[in-house]
Swiss-Prot record:
Residues 118-229 are annotated as: VTT domain. Belongs to the TMEM41 family. GO terms for biological process: autophagosome assembly; nervous system development. InterPro entries: TM41A/B (IPR045014), VTT_dom (IPR032816). It comes from the Eukaryota. This is Transmembrane protein 41B. The VTT domain was previously called the SNARE-assoc domain. As there is no evidence that this domain associates with SNARE proteins, it was renamed as VMP1, TMEM41, and TVP38 (VTT) domain. The keyword Methyltransferase does not apply.
Length: 269
């Protein structure tokens, strides 16, 4: 009986999203134009942020770019550490804006910025900064998806969105815990969580809080690794077996309240 009910619910979600895909399929081109416009405006704002940066030498200017590997991160860290005391606000604003920009548009590179924060700032500030940037950037991505991304989700991610929608409904009473669990664990890519959450009715407030708290444990690992930035050769070296074990324990703890309440509810019903 339960299996038939679950199958019926899955089919209902499938039909719902497919219907929305057909209804909004024609707006995909409009959504793309809006997305390009928003990206262009954001890129221009980033340009203004870097125009306000201190005067750099030609060699230093080559290092001011989004890091793609550990060598880029080391070169960028060397330049930023030179100027962060004299131009504290400018460096902090540039770091903040870049991190949020990458998260908003799901551009790779934020892991290196997380590591870099541990090199540039005291641990408490670095952790708060990374959690805030991650929470805001993911929330902006959420709002962007709500505004222009739904046709893409309906058309290309229908099946995956349906499966996650079912999981969200099962954990609706403990949605913050579930979001925290997903942020700690690698079961779902962050970009997928960001763009599908508004489509399956995850509230923005819950989404932000769950993200802010959920990224803290993995960020803790990256920031601690940043204190030894110049000893690292790849981002993978930032994660040890001990840190993976700790993350696993924290992930289990984050979902325990939901499991206990579910068991208690079943016991007393």
């Amino acid at each position: 009986m339960a299996q038939r009910r679950a199958a019926a619910e899955s089919a209902r979600h499938q039909r719902l999203l497919e219907g929305k895909a057909q209804a909004e399929g024609g707006s995909a081109r409009t959504s793309l134009l809006i997305l390009v416009s928003i990206f262009t405006i954001a890129a221009f704002l980033m340009f203004l942020v870097y125009k306000n940066f201190p005067q750099l030498s030609e060699e230093e200017g080559k290092c001011i770019k989004i890091p793609r590997d550990m060598d880029d991160a080391k070169a960028l860290g060397k330049v930023l550490s030179k100027y962060k005391d004299t131009f504290y606000v400018q460096v902090l604003v540039a770091y903040f804006a870049t991190y949020v920009f990458l998260q908003t548009f799901a551009i790779p590179g934020s892991i290196f910025l997380s590591i870099l924060s541990g090199f540039l700032y005291p641990f408490p500030l670095a952790l708060f900064l990374v959690c805030l940037c991650s929470g805001l950037g993911a929330s902006f991505c959420y709002m962007l998806s709500y505004l222009v991304g739904r046709p893409v989700v309906y058309k290309y991610l229908t099946e995956k969105a349906v499966k996650w929608s079912e999981q969200v409904e099962r954990h609706r009473e403990h949605l913050i815990n579930y979001i925290i669990f997903l942020r700690i664990t690698p079961f779902l890519p962050n970009w997928f969580i960001n763009i599908t959450s508004p489509v399956i009715n995850v509230p923005l407030k819950v989404f932000f809080i769950g993200t802010f708290l959920g990224v803290a444990p993995p960020s803790f690992v990256a920031i601690k690794a940043g204190t030894t930035l110049y000893q690292l050769t790849t981002a993978g070296e930032a994660v040890s077996w001990n840190s993976l074990f700790v993350l696993m324990i924290l992930a289990i703890l984050s979902i325990l309240p939901a499991l206990f309440q579910k068991k208690l509810k079943q016991k007393f019903e």
